[in-house]
Amino acid sequence: IQGVWDKRTITPLERPARFENRAFLSPEEILEYEAASAEREDGRPLDFSRTSISVHDPDDLDYGSRYVTTGQTSLVVEPSSGRIPAYTEAADKRAEEARKMREGRGPADSWIDRNLSERCLTWGVPQGMLPQPYNNNLKILQTPDHVMFYLEMAHDVRIIPLDGRPHLPENLRLWHGDSRGHWEGDTLVVRTKNFSPKSNFRRANVALETEERFRRNAEDQLEYILKIKDDTTWVSEWSVSYPMERSDGPIYEFACHEGNYGLLNILSVARTLEKQERENK
């Protein structure tokens, strides 16, 4: 499975309501979907009448232009609805408690108030393994006893042992979780647990566990299956599946800290507003 792989696709993560219970599109519908997507992205101007303009220029975004070759109506394949399961009461309670903790404290008191991706630290696991608005390349390197995933987005690196060693003790928690891999025939299986409470994947708790499967089902295609389990967050397990396409191009540097004016400006504006408020008293 070694090589550089392209995760881009315009296929939605969850099945749109208009497709209801349909798991796949016809070839004709795929062509129509791709044409409509291209029309939306072609020279779209920013709407400066809005109170907040887009973070990125449309030319900087690169979702790709192709639907997945499988024709599935969503990347979510389980449950059969193609939709992410509902949150548990515990997950809703955690979200409400987090909201209350932020009351009276602005989201820009400090750089630590901003999320990990805004701070150029990590896009996270398994979020980084899913298609993104840009930087969708994944480089895989293999040795007899390790596999390395180098993600273009946020220059995330995952080094995964294949030698059968046990997982770390549960009190050791990592942003990317603790991954262990093994081969089942021609399929690489990676299981990850021990996520840090600082990780943030769709409200998931430290109980989050994932299983990833990588199988080269064609010379230029890598099948990826992601199973997600956290019974403190979702009412049932759910799975994502999609094919990555081989890329011949290199992965260029992801320079984020060097040009992270967004974080600087957020904090600077917050301090300016606080100063104005003090002066107006």
Question: What residues fall within each predicted segment?
Answer:
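PEST-like low-complexity, intrinsically disordered acidic/proline/serine-rich tracts
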Residues: I1-K281
